[in-house]
């Protein structure tokens, strides 16, 4: 086939195919001979052969165990991102890997065209743990959000009797729910939306934490609103915690206006914030909960939507599905992942260690009050908010590069915020090591960075959201 294509496509295609075969053969030969690739070689290969849709910290993960990462050269790091909270249980948890191995040797995929002997157990375990009547399995977090939106719209038409094609979803400014087209249609991130239009209609925006604004939208449009989608703590926005009582007020407003309360717990759920769900901080029960990330412990992608029968059974056979959703491999891994959370007391551990970590970071803030504006978080989902004026012309990304050089891996969210979310298995000593590294970077590295980096006007420019006009972080 390749030869035929080459003949039809002319010499250019033939040469391209030849180059491709040559490169593949060389790489295959190197690997067959056991030649180890360096971090630099691997990063170069990714830059040349993969889409540039990420701006990663320049470190290559080669092996992970607990809260530790090794690169190909054997350098050891402490992970303070946890794959955006997907590895709450720690990298390569032995109990989860055991479940993976045992199931992989039996059956990996059936599709939902047939039953398998693992998904029903997962469904029963998950719904019992979180107190909902039913669940709908998917794979990625974005799929979970899309599923929830479809489900809530269907409920709106069937149960609330919203006129055809007029259902609305309300979401929050600064939200992050994924990268699919339906989800970015709610986004305030210009990078996520520019150049990808037209966006999907049927969305209204409100400021996060603004109950008065939410009530006004509900009063003005309530007959057509089927759901309010929110993060209990906004992760990508910079670990933004709502005012006390906000979630209870939202619960009351949704109940009063017959609007479904949809909690995106993909990043905040599964013990990350010191509660099993972040909504538990105010003891409220959403109508719909979306889970993902740590549901698969970083081993396989697993997501799920939880709801009661009155909502979930609005979806009929053939109206929604996923080839891999509910597969036996993911189901076995998810049950093992949840058991690790309960058996190892990760909820309590996150609450205790999170408070200790914030105490340490606040001591660093006391040393550098002109640089650190705020330390905030719940459990082991935390952020350090830096002053743009004190940091300039450096950025949070530059700080993360220096943290990496001191053995701590973290990622910025926006130009001045650093999210710190290690695996919940991390030790108190490792938290103290990271706090010291942060202090050392501000004391020793930042002054040198500010001398080396040339100040540019563009770095100081403010941006506003294309959708709602609000200032971006």
From Swiss-Prot:
A matching Pfam family: Aminotran_3
Catalytic class of the enzyme: transferase
Induction profile: Up-regulated by SNAC2. Also induced by high-salinity, heat, and submergence. Strongly induced by abscisic acid (ABA) and auxin (IAA), and slightly induced by brassinosteroid (BR) and jasmonic acid (JA).
GO molecular function, one term: ornithine aminotransferase activity
Involved pathway(s): Amino-acid biosynthesis; L-proline biosynthesis; L-glutamate 5-semialdehyde from L-ornithine: step 1/1
The organelle targeting sequence, given as a residue range: 1-32
Cellular component annotations (GO), alphabetically ordered: cytoplasm; mitochondrial matrix
Example GO biological process: response to jasmonic acid
Catalytic function, reaction form: a 2-oxocarboxylate + L-ornithine = L-glutamate 5-semialdehyde + an L-alpha-amino acid
EC numbers: 2.6.1.13
PTM annotation (N6-(pyridoxal phosphate)lysine): residues: 293
Subcellular localization: Mitochondrion matrix
Family annotation (InterPro entries): Aminotrans_3, Aminotrans_3_PPA_site, Class-III_PLP-dep_AT, Orn_aminotrans, PyrdxlP-dep_Trfase, PyrdxlP-dep_Trfase_major, PyrdxlP-dep_Trfase_small
Origin: domain of life: Eukaryota
Cofactor: pyridoxal 5'-phosphate
Record's keyword terms, sorted: Aminotransferase, Mitochondrion, Pyridoxal phosphate, Transferase, Transit peptide
Similarity comment text for this entry: Belongs to the class-III pyridoxal-phosphate-dependent aminotransferase family.
Quaternary data: Homotetramer.
NCBIfam families: Orn_aminotrans
Described function: Confers drought and oxidative stress tolerance mainly through enhancing ROS-scavenging capacity and Pro pre-accumulation.
Name recorded for this polypeptide: Ornithine aminotransferase, mitochondrial
């Amino acid at each position: 086939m390749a030869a035929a294509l080459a003949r039809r496509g002319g010499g250019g295609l033939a040469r391209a195919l030849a180059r491709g075969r040559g490169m593949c053969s060389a790489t295959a030969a190197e690997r067959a001979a056991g030649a180890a690739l360096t971090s630099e070689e691997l990063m170069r290969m990714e830059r040349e052969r993969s889409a540039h849709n990420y701006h990663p910290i320049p470190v290559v993960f080669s092996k992970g165990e607990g809260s530790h990462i090794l690169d190909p050269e054997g350098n050891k790091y402490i992970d303070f991102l946890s794959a955006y909270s997907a590895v709450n249980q720690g990298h390569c948890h032995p109990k989860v890997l055991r479940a993976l191995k045992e199931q992989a040797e039996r059956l990996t995929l059936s599709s939902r065209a047939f039953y398998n002997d693992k998904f029903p157990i997962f469904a029963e375990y998950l719904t019992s743990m979180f107190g909902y009547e039913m669940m709908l399995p998917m794979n990625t977090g974005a799929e979970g959000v899309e599923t929830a939106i479809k489900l809530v719209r269907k409920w709106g038409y069937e149960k609330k009797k919203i006129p055809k094609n007029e259902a609305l979803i309300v979401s929050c400014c600064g939200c992050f729910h994924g990268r699919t087209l339906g989800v970015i249609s709610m986004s305030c991130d210009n990078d996520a939306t520019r150049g990808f239009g037209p966006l999907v209609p049927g969305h209204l925006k409100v400021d996060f934490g603004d109950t008065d604004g939410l009530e006004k939208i509900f009063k003005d449009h309530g007959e057509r609103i089927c759901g309010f989608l929110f993060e209990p703590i906004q992760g990508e926005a910079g670990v933004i915690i709502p005012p006390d009582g906000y979630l209870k007020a939202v619960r009351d407003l949704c109940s009063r206006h017959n609007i479904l309360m949809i909690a995106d717990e993909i990043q905040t759920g599964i013990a990350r914030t010191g509660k099993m769900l972040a909504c538990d901080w105010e003891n409220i029960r959403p109508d719909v909960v979306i889970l993902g990330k740590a549901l698969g412990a970083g081993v396989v992608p697993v997501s799920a939507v939880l709801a009661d029968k009155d909502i979930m059974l609005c979806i009929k056979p053939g109206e929604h599905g996923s080839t891999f959703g509910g597969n036996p491999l993911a189901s076995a891994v998810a049950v093992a992942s949840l058991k690790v959370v309960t058996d190892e007391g990760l909820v309590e551990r996150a609450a205790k260690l999170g408070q200790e970590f914030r105490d340490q970071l606040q001591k660093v803030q006391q040393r550098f009050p002109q640089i650190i504006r705020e330390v905030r978080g719940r459990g082991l989902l935390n952020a350090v908010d830096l002053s743009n004026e004190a940091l300039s012309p450096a950025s949070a990304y530059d700080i993360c590069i220096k943290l990496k050089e001191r053995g701590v891996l973290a990622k910025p969210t926006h130009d001045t915020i650093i999210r710190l979310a290690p695996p919940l298995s991390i030790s108190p000593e490792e938290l103290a090591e990271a706090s010291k590294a942060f202090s050392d970077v501000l004391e020793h590295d930042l002054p040198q960075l500010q001398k080396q980096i040339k100040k540019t006007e563009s770095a100081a420019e403010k941006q506003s959201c294309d959708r709602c006009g609000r200032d971006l972080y």
